Amino acid sequence: MYYNVINAWAFWYLFHSFQDPLPWSVCPLNGNHTGYDEECEKASSTQYFWYRKTLNISPSLQENGGVQWEPALCLLLAWLVVYLCILRGTESTGKVVYFTASLPYCVLIIYLIRGLTLHGATNGLMYMFTPKMEQLANPKAWVNAATQIFFSLGLGFGSLIAFASYNEPSNNCQKHAIIVSLINSFTSIFASIVTFSIYGFKATFNYENCLKKVSLLLTNTFDLEDGFLTASNLEQVKGYLASAYPSKYSEVFPHIKNCSLESELDTAVQGTGLAFIVYTEAIKNMEVSQLWSVLYFFMLLMLGIGSMLGNTAAILTPLTDSKIISSHLPKEAISGLVCLVNCAIGMVFTMEAGNYWFDIFNDYAATLSLLLIVLVETIAVCYVYGLRRFESDLKAMTGRAVSWYWKVMWAGVSPLLIVSLFVFYLSDYILTGTLKYQAWDASQGQLVTKDYPAYALAVIGLLVASSTMCIPLVALGTFVLHHLKRGDAAPVA
């Protein structure tokens, strides 16, 4: 429902990537053409393009605003592409997946070669591979890690089950599960190296640019010798100037920024900000920036479409397999209705407050529910269906007995780990207290923290409840119907 809006944003940035210069590389002029836009100057050109030109974001969640027609058209295009890819079911989806899965690797290899040659790339890689052991005690870190692996492997979404339903009975699912897991882990590390090499370049560029501005300001103000100030003696010189010329230093002090490479590396942006702010910040400073921008957002679009094919397959497979629905509607009509309904609901995320609603769905619709779904699946297979029956089925499929390792992991380790993550999630929720969100303040040119309004908290509660209660409610309904049928079938004395 909400994931395809990322593809809409990718389309928007891809279309603007052919402009020279890139529209997020410079701030626009103000209304009087006497200077740059005030909001852009206080923030940055990349933040301004994201929050103002792309989202046209409202100051708070309470101010929904209207639907923005440009993102809405991009969202419509994104759903049209998804519909064309799933039009003929797995026959067309399979061919598209080969392209959407392989092309990003080519782009990542190109970006890896370019990223490792950028100035400051090693700073990003050192930051990536430097462990922070204190984070192991943070429950949210474990929950985020589990959510990420669920998303990347598609666990709990139903897409794997939907695709697996088309396999031959003799398919060696054990071998494929191992291969997919290894490829996923390799891809995550590979993509992280690419990301942090670019991130290191961006942080180093901003750090050195900050040093140049501060050095120029101090050199001009105190008539210092050109080239006297360096990164190694800057703090020492600042201390001397503050003590020797206190009144003069106090005048320029508000304009002296604290330049630190560590702080630049620590100001990590998550989620959509990483894709549409951090990367664009780095791309705009590269040579032939239009080329790198087109490659990046085309890769992002391919990854997004590939993910959407799996998500829609999880919805369409049970609908098309249902005799009641498929007897009245052809497969193309079912696919079209699913895309149309989701596109209509997704228009909420193209409003001025749409990004706030997107964050709500992203944070609360598929976190706790994923843990519960995977836990129920594990318990259902191991303890309801029976581990021995499941082992017998796998032996019939693969021709080999299942190792003790897998049985221990399925029946013992996996449920315990999932329950632990469930406890971590609840403890983090309790420790967080009042739920808050990040809102864009145009007057300051930065994000500010605000409390969720009451109706937003109600929506969050509804999302969590609806996504977690579907399994027990359906189980209860099935149980009641089963007993009603047994009662009707009983002989009358």
What are these regions (language model features)?
Residues 3-24, 38-41, 105-128, 195-202, ...:
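Hydrophobic alpha-helical segments and their helix-loop junctions in multi-pass secondary transporters
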Residues 4, 41, 45-55, 62-87, ...:
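Hydrophobic, membrane-embedded alpha-helices of multi-pass small-molecule transporters
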Residues 347-349, 359-382, 402-493:
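A generic transmembrane alpha-helix motif of multi-pass inner-membrane proteins
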Residues 315-328, 353-359, 379-405, 488:
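Alpha-helical transmembrane segments
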Residues 6-80, 84, 90, 122-143, ...:
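Inter-helical loop and helix-membrane interface segments of multi-pass membrane transporters/permeases
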Residues 73-84, 100-106, 110, 183-190, ...:
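Lipid-exposed faces of alpha-helical membrane segments in multi-pass integral membrane proteins
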Residues 90, 94-310, 316-347, 351-363:
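Membrane-embedded translocation segments of transport machinery
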